[in-house]
Structure formats: C-alpha cells, structure tokens
C-alpha cells in the first residue's frame, strides 16, 4: 500500500534529519564547522526531519485515503475524497460525544487526573486512550481507525458510485451521492464507536 512505501522514505528522512540535527552526533563526526546555522546546512536536515514526521503524524489519514482509493473499482479519486470526508466526520462525532461526557484534552491530561484522585498508573492508562487527529480531540485508534473508515468508504463507493436518481435529484447521481452517504454512515459509526472503543482501547494498551 502507498503508506507503507511512504514510511520507508519518511523513516530515512527522520533518521538522517534526526542524526544531523543532534549536536552530539555533529560534534562526534567533527562536522560542527559544516553543519551549523551559519552555513544553513543544519536547516536542510531540520526540514528533512519535519517532512518525515508528517507521514507518521498523519499515518491514519493516509491509510484511510489509501484504502478508499486502492479498493475502489472505478472513480478512485472520488473514493479518496469521500474517505477523507468520512474520516473527519467519524472523529468529529466521536469528539462531540466525548465533550458531552466531559472528556476533553484538558480533563484527560495526566496531571489533571492525578489532581482529581486517580493513581499515577491509571492516569497514564486513561490518558493513553485519547489523542488529537487533525486538531480533533478523539480516541486514539491509530491506523486501525484509518483502515476502518477507508475500507467501509470503498465499499460504499463501489455500491453507489453509479447510482441513477430521478430527474429532480439528478445532480446528486453517480459519484456525487457517495460523499453524502459516507458522511451519514460514518457519523453513525462514529457515534457507536464513541461508546464501544474504550474497552477496546484498554485491551490494546494493556
């Protein structure tokens, strides 16, 4: 899959960038006169490191796009777009339900939990269930969440991308209806996952 190929280069960029932005490594290799802020070369390695980190930071989304695109029979671009929309809807719904339950980035922070009587181990354990995806506070599902949304989106796309609607609704025929259906289904699945993921997340982290 595309993300797996990207991981190879991302790892290379992170390794190279990380090594040559580390002051101990630079001094150990006697490259302080070359790799520094004056020559600007250190900035090149900082950029390489940042480029590699992007892939790992957004890996679940890339898996979602890859699954949506790769498993679609036709009109793969529309499938990938639907996957992205579905992924966002999925996590936004989870985030809103968590917020209703009083769970936010602040209220699940380790220090806050410890201040409110939770033990150190349980605080870290509970905190590990959550993350922020594209600025959305949600459950930490890693690449499973991306694949889950991507695979379902591809199945929705394959079933409905060639749908013909009555003339009065013809504008929404074909590929245009796929994002609408995807948003609806992923919103429902997001609501369900908001209530069932906690024990699953604990089983993974434990």
Kindly give the residue locations of the regions a language model identified:
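A short, ordered amphipathic alpha-helix with a cationic face
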Residues: 155, 176, 195-196
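Membrane-interface loop-to-helix entry segments
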Residues: 167-184, 205
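Transmembrane hairpin
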Residues: 163, 178, 200-202
């Amino acid at each position: 899959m595309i993300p797996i190929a990207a991981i190879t280069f991302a790892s290379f960029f992170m390794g190279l960038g990380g090594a040559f932005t580390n002051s101990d490594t630079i001094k150990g290799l006697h490259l302080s006169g070359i790799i520094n802020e004056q020559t600007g070369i250190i900035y090149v390695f900082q950029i390489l490191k940042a480029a590699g980190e992007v892939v790992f930071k957004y890996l679940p989304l890339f898996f979602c796009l890859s699954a949506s695109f790769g498993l679609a029979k036709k009109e793969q671009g529309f499938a990938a777009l639907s996957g992205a929309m579905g992924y966002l809807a999925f996590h936004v719904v989870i985030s809103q339900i968590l917020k209703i339950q009083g769970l936010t980035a602040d209220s699940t922070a380790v220090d806050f939990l410890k201040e409110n009587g939770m033990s150190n181990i349980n605080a870290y354990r509970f905190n590990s269930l959550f993350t922020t995806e594209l600025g959305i506070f949600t459950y930490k599902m890693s690449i499973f969440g991306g694949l889950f949304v991507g695979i379902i989106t591809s199945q929705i796309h394959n079933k409905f991308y060639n749908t013909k609607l009555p003339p009065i609704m013809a504008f929404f025929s074909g590929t245009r209806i796929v994002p609408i259906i995807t948003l609806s289904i992923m919103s429902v699945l997001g609501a369900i996952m908001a209530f069932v993921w906690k024990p699953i997340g604990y089983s993974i982290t434990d």
